């Protein structure tokens, strides 16, 4: 009998209908709870991470001249740009020729930088971005404007994953957009 029910259900709904949703289905309560949790986890994370951020900031400044905290423009929710914070893992002039992704054994990456990238310690200052509301603990990774523009031309639905208001995006398309 359960096989008959599943057959009926599969005839009544298309896969696209089952795997799609609209942002308006998320309630204000859900978004408020998510924001409170972001603030809570960011505060706890910063309490734990600040000593590490301080130590690695000193090590970065001792190894190479320049600021320890690196800021980079990213595209956030609704396509709004913001400054993302990271511990600097590359030499100061690393992107003088333009925006490129780091490669394996990239000569622009410092010795301390290689370690903090491998251990993801370079990402700890992003807890300040979460606290400010620029980004969330859970959600799509904010990308650089140059790459966002490139991906929106190559990957259908890429910018919709940023939650720019009312939208419809299938789960499988959202997964591809995050890749």
UniProtKB/Swiss-Prot annotation:
EC main group: transferase
Subcellular location: Cell membrane
EC number(s) stated in the UniProt entry for this protein: 2.7.8.40
TM annotation in the entry: 39-59
Keyword list, A-Z: Cell membrane, Cell wall biogenesis/degradation, Glycosyltransferase, Membrane, Stress response, Transferase, Transmembrane, Transmembrane helix
Major site of localization recorded for this protein: membrane
Reactions mediated catalytically: di-trans,octa-cis-undecaprenyl phosphate + UDP-N-acetyl-alpha-D-galactosamine = N-acetyl-alpha-D-galactosaminyl-di-trans,octa-cis-undecaprenyl diphosphate + UMP
Note: The nature of the anionic polymer present in the cell wall of B.subtilis depends on phosphate availability. Under phosphate-replete growth conditions teichoic acids are present, whereas under phosphate-depleted conditions, at least part of the wall teichoic acid is replaced with teichuronic acid, a non-phosphate containing anionic polymer. The synthesis of teichuronic acid is accompanied by degradation of teichoic acid and reutilization of liberated phosphate for other cellular processes such as nucleic acid synthesis.
Membrane topology qualifier: Single-pass membrane protein
Role description: Might mediate the very first reaction in teichuronic synthesis, i.e. the formation of lipid-linked N-acetylglucosamine.
Gene Ontology molecular function: glycosyltransferase activity; phosphotransferase activity, for other substituted phosphate groups
Name of the protein this chain belongs to: Putative undecaprenyl-phosphate N-acetylgalactosaminyl 1-phosphate transferase
Pathway: Cell wall biogenesis; teichuronic acid biosynthesis
Family: Belongs to the bacterial sugar transferase family.
Induction: By phosphate starvation, via the PhoP/PhoR two-component regulatory system.
Gene it is expressed from: tuaA
Lineage: Bacteria, Bacillati, Bacillota, Bacilli, Bacillales
Disulfide bonds: none
Coiled-coil residue spans: none
Gene Ontology CC annotations of this record: plasma membrane
KW Metal-binding (keyword) present: no
Example of a GO biological process term: teichuronic acid biosynthetic process
């Amino acid at each position: 009998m359960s096989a008959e029910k599943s057959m009926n259900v599969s005839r009544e709904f298309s896969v696209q209908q089952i795997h799609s949703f609209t942002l308006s289905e998320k309630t204000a309560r859900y978004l408020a709870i998510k924001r409170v949790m972001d603030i809570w986890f960011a505060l706890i994370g910063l309490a734990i991470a600040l000593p590490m951020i301080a130590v690695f900031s000193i090590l970065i400044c001792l190894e190479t001249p320049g600021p320890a905290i690196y800021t980079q423009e990213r595209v956030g929710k609704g396509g709004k740009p913001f400054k993302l914070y990271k511990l600097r893992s590359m030499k100061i002039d690393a992107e003088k020729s333009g925006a490129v992704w780091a490669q394996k054994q990239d000569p622009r990456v410092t010795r301390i930088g290689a370690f903090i990238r491998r251990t993801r310690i370079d990402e700890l200052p992003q807890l300040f971005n979460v606290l400010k509301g620029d980004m969330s603990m859970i959600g799509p990774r904010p990308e650089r404007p140059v790459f966002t523009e490139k991906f929106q031309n190559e990957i259908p639905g890429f910018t919709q994953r940023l939650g720019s208001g009312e939208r419809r995006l299938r789960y499988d398309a959202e997964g591809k957009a995050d890749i």
